[in-house]
């Protein structure tokens, strides 16, 4: 016979109460945790960002489409179609004529320099294990910040465009033809009036897109393009629906004359996609990145619309756009630049005295660093990191061809391959696909990117390497060994240029020994660091600035990686957490998609509180009822035993 005394009964109630409190505690902690560490099924994940009590972004807190107005005292700083800045003095023309300053007679022509210095027989993988995402993000960021169009008759009023075609001798090993030929080169468009032959008037160039990291590569830099890209329904951007997933909107020039212009070379323009930047179709890897961030915008827009059913299309669009811009900024500053070995000073606050305008030295020289980091192979891999059925691509097979995305598996295989492959070392050498066969075979439109990069620097009046260094406060070099410890490169420079003060700035920067723990030489490192510091500190709406209406989200945005965006917008299930470093072991690709909850630290609205209260009360009452029933049943059993 059981002796169920008052002490035992008290203990029972005590334990039951503890159980109730424990369950309630677990309920609250699971409901309001900031970040869940447990991976979830991607198909079941519809809300990676949960932003409570959102408010629409006011007009004054939005990035304007053309980049103007961020600085109230200097509203044109960073705006599209404004003059690029210049840190170093212009290269002096021998005859004093500004129209021919590019025609240097004291050094070989750019193709000769390319053949003598930039030819590479064997690719050397990056010594710091950087992946192909480094050069790709560099290209994506370049198209986000600067675009100087050329006088090719399509983008300039001149019927007779200003040219500086590059001679190719008939004995050229790769491009030679009997009688020789010229590689086409159109000079950059100039700011109105700067083509005056008066030597006192300098020839300057406009940046036709915004300087800011403001998502212009996704949203455009002018009203016509920006409006065309929008769906004007639920804050979304236009897409094309393919079996491979949502892709960019298709160009349809025949039926829609308002379709924004895109760059075409060697393929039917009706096959192209339309993006915020006109160069999106240049390569399938670049196109994949464009698609990724349009998907991210629409994902954000859908979730913002679901949480805020009363918001207008414009309010949803601008909020999603602002977060997407913040993601581009954080990937650039907290993943891309550190992968190059560039560590900026900690962000303090917006500084209205800083001019962020893109400089000539950055645009046409230093930030072309990625051109030597592009290899000849374009890997495409399945979920097990094996080649897909259609196989890998060569780099040149990816130029202006969208079929690898539209017909051969979408962007997933490309994004996996980029994370797997180690990019070439940043050095003086260019891949053969870029140096002899860019956009086509030799004699059939094929170009030499190294020669074009050199000629573009001369076209923009960039002075010699030592003068550029001096302009940025760096010491001039006296000997070839000061530039590089590589004896072979020293000999190439010595045999190509008459003296150390004649070296093209681009070649000098590529030849430099790297800064310790960096992928860059000193000059390139210094110029890139300077430009990105000015872009950040001179941006009133930078996501870390307290002027930004997403300021309260800064820590969550800062902790978002490119891997996160890939995982939540593609079929990819596993990838390394830092995709800027290559990983070739499948078991190390352990960055799975987490259910990240972003809160701006504002209290939930009244409807949220009411719902939480009702659910909690129901939960507690249910538990109390269960406990009471258990106690009653136990007491009945005791009474029966006592009667026996």
Regions found by a protein language model. Give the residues of each.
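A glycine-rich phosphate-binding loop feature that marks nucleotide/adenosyl-phosphate handling sites
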Residues: 484-488, 641-643
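Secretory targeting signatures
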Residues: 1-39, 603-644
């Amino acid at each position: 016979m059981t002796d169920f005394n008052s002490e035992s009964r008290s203990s029972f109630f005590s334990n039951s109460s503890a159980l109730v409190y424990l369950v309630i505690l677990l309920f609250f902690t699971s409901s309001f945790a900031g970040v869940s560490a447990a991976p979830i099924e991607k198909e079941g994940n519809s809300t990676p960002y949960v932003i409570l009590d959102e408010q629409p972004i006011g007009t004054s807190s939005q990035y304007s489409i053309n980049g103007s107005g961020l600085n109230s005292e200097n509203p044109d700083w960073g705006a599209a179609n404004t003059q690029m800045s210049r840190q170093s003095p212009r290269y002096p023309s021998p005859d004093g004529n500004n129209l021919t300053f590019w025609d240097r007679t004291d050094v070989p022509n750019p193709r000769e320099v390319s053949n003598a210095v930039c030819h590479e027989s064997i690719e050397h993988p990056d010594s710091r294990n950087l992946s192909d995402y480094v050069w790709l993000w560099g290209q994506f960021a370049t198209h986000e910040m600067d675009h100087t169009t050329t006088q090719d008759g399509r983008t300039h009023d001149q019927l007779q465009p200003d040219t500086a075609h590059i001679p190719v001798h008939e004995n050229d090993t790769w491009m030679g033809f009997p009688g020789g030929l010229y590689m086409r080169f159109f000079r950059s468009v100039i700011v109105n009036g700067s083509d005056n032959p008066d030597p006192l008037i300098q020839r300057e160039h406009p940046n036709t897109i915004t300087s800011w990291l403001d998502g212009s590569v996704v949203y455009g830099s002018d009203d016509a393009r920006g409006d065309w890209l929008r769906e004007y329904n639920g804050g979304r951007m236009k897409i094309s629906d393919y079996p491979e997933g949502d892709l960019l909107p298709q160009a349809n020039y025949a039926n829609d004359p308002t379709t924004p212009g895109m760059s075409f070379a060697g393929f039917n323009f009706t096959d192209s996609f339309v993006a915020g930047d006109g160069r999106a179709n240049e390569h399938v890897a670049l196109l994949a990145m464009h698609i990724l961030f349009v998907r991210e915008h629409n994902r954000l827009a859908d979730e913002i619309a679901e949480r805020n059913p009363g918001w207008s299309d414009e309010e949803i669009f601008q909020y999603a756009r602002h977060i997407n811009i913040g993601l581009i900024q954080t990937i650039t500053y907290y993943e891309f630049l550190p992968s190059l070995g560039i560590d900026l000073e900690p962000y303090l606050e917006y500084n209205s005295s800083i001019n962020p305008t893109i400089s000539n030295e950055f645009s046409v020289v230093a930030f072309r660093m990625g051109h030597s980091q592009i290899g000849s192979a374009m890997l495409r891999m399945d979920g097990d990191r094996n080649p897909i059925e259609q196989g890998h691509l060569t780099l040149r097979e990816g130029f202006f061809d969208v079929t690898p995305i539209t017909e051969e598996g979408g962007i997933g295989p490309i994004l996996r391959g980029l994370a797997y492959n180690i990019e070439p070392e940043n050095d003086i050498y260019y891949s053969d696909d870029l140096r002899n066969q860019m956009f086509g075979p030799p004699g059939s439109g094929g170009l030499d990117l190294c020669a074009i990069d050199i000629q573009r620097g001369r076209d923009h009046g960039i002075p010699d390497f030592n003068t550029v260094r001096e302009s940025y406060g760096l010491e001039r070099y006296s000997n070839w060994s000061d530039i590089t410890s590589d004896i072979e490169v020293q000999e190439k420079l010595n045999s190509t240029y008459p003296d150390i003060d004649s070296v093209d700035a681009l070649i000098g920067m590529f030849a430099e020994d790297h800064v310790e723990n960096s992928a860059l030489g000193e000059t390139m490192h210094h110029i890139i660091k300077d430009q990105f510091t000015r872009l950040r500190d001179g941006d009133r709406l930078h996501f870390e600035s307290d002027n930004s209406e997403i300021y309260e989200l800064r820590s969550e945005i800062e902790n978002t990686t490119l891997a996160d965006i890939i995982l939540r917008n593609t079929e990819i299930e596993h990838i390394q957490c830092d995709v800027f470093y290559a990983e070739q072991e499948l078991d190390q690709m352990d960055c799975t998609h987490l259910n990240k909850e972003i809160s701006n630290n504002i209290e939930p609205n009244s409807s949220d509180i009411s719902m939480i209260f009702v659910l909690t009360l129901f939960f507690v009452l249910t538990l109390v009822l269960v406990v009471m029933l258990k106690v009653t049943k136990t007491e009945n059993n005791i009474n029966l035993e006592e009667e026996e």
